[in-house]
Amino acid sequence: IKTLNNHYGEFDIYIGHSLGSMAILKYCEQASNVKKIVTIGSGDQMRTIFDNFITSVGLKFKTLERMKTYFQDKYNININDYDASYVVRQQQTPSLIVHDEDDLDIDVSCSVNIHKQHPKATLMVTKGLGHRRILRDEKVIHKVISFIQAS
């Protein structure tokens, strides 16, 4: 995100999907000129992301702990500080949070948690679109456009 901003200039609207939503929320935690944020199918807790990765590739729980420690030590961070529902607690940028209740990749509860913690968020929950089809659904597209165009 920083690289894109350095190359093209600062954006004032950010739209992200899945893990990209989490990255945008973390970036916007420190950004001052952001006017609107849209997340679609966002994850929430980094621990869950790591758990799902470990499970999907068939690794052991011990590996998860090693990965977590590696990232925390290498980048001098607390991995929990990257949880989306944590980074939005002080967010004052109007945000639209979109998620499908039939998303099999990332549970809708992630976006519900983000919405509960975000003081300026609107939540849109859809049905029957899943994690990817939601991106091309006309109702979702119109909602996102309306949200961005609203003053």
Predicted regions and their residues:
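Catalytic histidine-centered segment of alpha/beta-hydrolase-like enzymes
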Residues: 129-141
